[in-house]
Amino acid sequence: MESVFTARESFVRACVRSFVSSLPDILISRLRGDEEDSMKLFCSGDDAPATTPKPKDGTRGEKGDRSGKQDVDRFGYYQMIMFSIISLPLFLSAGFTLAYVFTAGEVKYRCLVPECENANDTSFDVPWAAESAPDISEMSKCARYEVINHTDQCTDQVFSNVTRKCDSWIYDPSENTILSEWGLTCDVNRWKLTLVGTINNVGQFVGLIFAGYVSDRYGRRTILTLATFLSGISGLIHSFSVNYWMFLAFEFIDATVGAGIYSAGFILGMEMAGVKGRVLASTITSCLFAVGEVLLGLIAMWTRSWRLILRLVYGPALLAILMPFLIPESVRWLLANGKHDKVERIYRKMARMNGLSINDEAIGEFKEVNMVKTEKTEQLEKKNPLMQILGSSVMMTRLLACSFCWLTNTFVYYGLSLNSVAFAGDKYTNFILVAIVEIPAYFLTWFMTDWLGRKITLSSSFLLSGVFCLAIQFVPSGSWSFIPLILYMGGKWCITMSFSTVYIYTAELFPTNVRHSLLGICSMTGRMGSILSPQTPLLAQIMPALPLILFGCMSLSAGLLSLIFPETLGTKLPDTVGEAENIGKPQLKQDAQDSPS
């Protein structure tokens, strides 16, 4: 009895020592929700008390086999390293998507008064500038007062009340955009600035058509590497544009070749993470995009030059040429395409880098679960997967509903962002702050999707965003002026949560062999919302409250429509159309416990 007690005491001490040294693993595991797995790591078989029964045949036993399989699948240091590498294109994709906000942005300018100054020898802030124009509105940039009683040096008294159109302009030298580069001033040229954003979104729309096909046909790593590297080349050429039309052409090319970067990185991270780490992977990728927005804002604030912005944003993308040597292909994509030997090598490397042992029995069980297909599954896979989708009313209904949710997300998200310019402040600071606000929203999404489920998180965030947007119309004016701002930011917070949720939800609702293609279709539909959202400020000229009413009604509709989706919390990613149709059923949840993800 005493020897048993001593053995148990030694075991406890060994566990305590290992607990201290393995504290980072515990924290990571708690975030994943698999504390039992991490406890098994540092309370290994070598520390077990002598009285612990062992299988007589020298094998690990049934429980050991299951644990070995879970070890291979756990979100450990291997996954952390892979996410660190994937973070580069995810950072850059934010800059690729939103750089036009600064490259084609407004700058301060005023009319040149040739009677008082020389274009080559003057300054933007001259003492008489305020008196040379009718007022401080937009008209002051495009019209000026005529000069009377001209002397060698102008004063406030030399201007008459007669106005004339400006022939040339003086720009604020503190920043340089295509507006000041090519004189895109006044209302007659305003369409050229807004066209840049439209062309960017059209390019992404076109690019998503090809990105989804390349990803599902040739692999996630292939499209991620190719799109990032080609974007780097195109973006650098873009920065040397000699006129507006060359700039516009490469804006389209940049957006087209880079359209699949974020979705490919997102899916690669999702398929790498497994069931327990899936929401964590979604949160990380969303936060990486938000951090990329912050970095873009800091670069723009520091350089204030559209050419330097493009070079600093697109230049690092050339490093993507190294990506095939640093990250593996998606395991789920390899399995779906019958490349089982490569999968085994990846899992062995994963176990080695995570400091785990893996035996042939665990690999054997892995092969049995993932490589042995029934005749029914093989017959299904011989069919065109897209034709299977078209032939399934469940999948088509799901696809249409997802597409509307994406359309609403992008329309409301970008619409609220664009209409927020009514709030005063430095544009660089405002851009950075809006990006930072998204990060806590993503982490709240992580908590809610893991604890409450995907369906309730998506539906409630849509509904609350709609309520916030509509509630602004009922706030009395005057002393209640701060309430609309709070409600407005609440709407932006909730639509950010729905944006994060719909990405992971869409990836979980569709089978592996068409996942990126269908995600691309949804994203393409959503891109229509981002194309239309720049026009929403024009609706305010008809009725000031019309944009927010439209945002609110669409959000409420999407929130109700999303209730038709099945809950995917705790289920494995479906590999076939049949599995996708049966998502959420008890047997699928059991499969998630018995097979790697």
Q: What is the role of each PLM region?
A:
Residues 93, 258, 262, 273-324, ...:
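Glycine-rich segments within core transmembrane alpha-helices of 12-TM secondary carriers
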Residues 208-228:
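Conserved MFS/SLC helix-loop-helix module at the cytosolic interface between two early adjacent transmembrane helices
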Residues 201-209, 290, 294, 438-443, ...:
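Residue-level signature of mid-helix packing/kink "hotspots" within the transmembrane helices
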Residues 56-80, 134-192, 353-418, 422-423, ...:
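Flexible cytoplasmic loops linking transmembrane helices in multi-pass membrane transporters
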